[in-house]
Amino acid sequence: MSEPNPFGGRITHLTPAEVKAGMEDGRILLIDVREPDEIRAERIPGAAVMALSAFDAAALPDAQGKQIVFSCRSGQRSQRAAAIAQASGQQLEQHMQGGILGWKQAGFPTERG
C-alpha cells in the first residue's frame, strides 16, 4: 500500500520475501542504489546497480515490462531514489523495506560484487 514518502512523493514498502519472489518469477527488476564500495563488498544476486550519488532517473535500465524496485543498505536511500524518480516524472514508488540488511535477515543469499 502506498503512503507518503518522507523524501517526497509516495512510497510502497515491499518485504524482502516479496522482492525475492518477484525477481524469481521475472516480475521485479531490483535496483541497488548503494555506493560502489558497498556493492563490491556484498550485493544481492541479480540486482542492477545505480549509486544514489550519481542517480539519474533518465538513465535507469530498461525494465522490459518488470516493476522497478529500489534497494539500499537499510531502506532510506531507496526511498530517496524513489522520490528523485517521481520528481523527474516517473511513477516509481516501490522499495525493499530493510534493504540488504533485511534481505540477509530473511536468510536470502548475497554475493561479492
Residue ranges and their predicted role:
Residues 1-29, 36-69, 76-113:
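Rhodanese-like catalytic fold shared by cysteine-dependent sulfurtransferases
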